[in-house]
Amino acid sequence: MALKNFNPITPSLRELVQVDKTNLWKGRPLKSLTKGMSKTGGRNQQGRITSWHRGGGHKKLYRVIDFKRKKIDIFAVVERIEYDPNRTAFIALIKYDDGEYSYILAPQKLSIGDRVISSQAADIKIGNCLPLKSIPIGTTLHNVEMKVGKGGQIARSAGTSVELVGKDSGYAQIKLRSGEFRLVPLDCKATIGSISNPDQKNINLGKAGRNRWLGWRPHVRGVAMNPIDHPHGGGEGKTSGGRHPVTPWGFSTKGKKTRKNKRTSKFIVKKRK
């Protein structure tokens, strides 16, 4: 996919850069593989804000994605490549030889008419899903499981992938884009190839309103608030906040480590850069 630039006939078009989606499916998604979504506005069941700067946005249907690739040893044909408003990657509608339809994450270079399969021992081909023990070292992967049978969790965003760098003592060692090296059980599944839409990182929304369409509200700085609302608030005139950057609850921010799950730290061979 290429990038689209626009003639600056309005100020918001001057900086706008979008991904060219002319080759994607133009119709509606498959109805049997969609669900309705209700908006939370960033609120939990008590009505309190748990995720700031969320709200509004265009109504969306959720596409049910098969992250587990649970149909084993049955070939499927790629019917079409579609846009999914719920994620940055594109998705592929596949039809199995027994007639069942399914959505999967579309890897780069997957084309309409390609045949893919999920198997214990399949060809090392774009879109095929295999256990890590059956994949040769050096292969580029996406949608990698962290627990056997749970479904892919690693490398699902646009343009992402991991590299299989080693196997030892029942675990595979994978290298993430962040530079982290992590151990994953050899029986976990992964799909061959990199995720589609690598140009997603180069887009420019062009105007604030386009962010509102995506469900994001304005991000207000702490120094622009009153003292009751933020530790950086208040002061006469424009101030710098008067202290090291903190969250609205007074905890240090900008680089402070927040990961607390020491139980699974043993699976991280090398921390991210």
From Swiss-Prot:
One of its GO terms (biological process) is translation. Gene3D superfamilies: 2.30.30.30, Nucleic acid-binding proteins, Ribosomal protein L2, domain 3. InterPro entries: NA-bd_OB-fold, Rib_uL2_dom2, Ribosomal_uL2, Ribosomal_uL2_bac/org-type, Ribosomal_uL2_C, Ribosomal_uL2_CS, Ribosomal_uL2_dom3, Ribosomal_uL2_RNA-bd_dom. The keyword Mitochondrion does not apply. Residues 228-273 are annotated as: Disordered. GO terms for molecular function: rRNA binding; structural constituent of ribosome; transferase activity. Transmembrane segments: none annotated. Pfam families: Ribosomal_L2 (PF00181), Ribosomal_L2_C (PF03947). Residues 254-273 have a biased composition (Basic residues). Keywords: Ribonucleoprotein, Ribosomal protein, RNA-binding, rRNA-binding. GO terms for cellular component: large ribosomal subunit. Belongs to the universal ribosomal protein uL2 family. Part of the 50S ribosomal subunit. Forms a bridge to the 30S subunit in the 70S ribosome. One of the primary rRNA binding proteins. Required for association of the 30S and 50S subunits to form the 70S ribosome, for tRNA binding and peptide bond formation. It has been suggested to have peptidyltransferase activity; this is somewhat controversial. Makes several contacts with the 16S rRNA in the 70S ribosome. This is Large ribosomal subunit protein uL2. It comes from Rickettsia typhi (strain ATCC VR-144 / Wilmington). The gene is rplB.
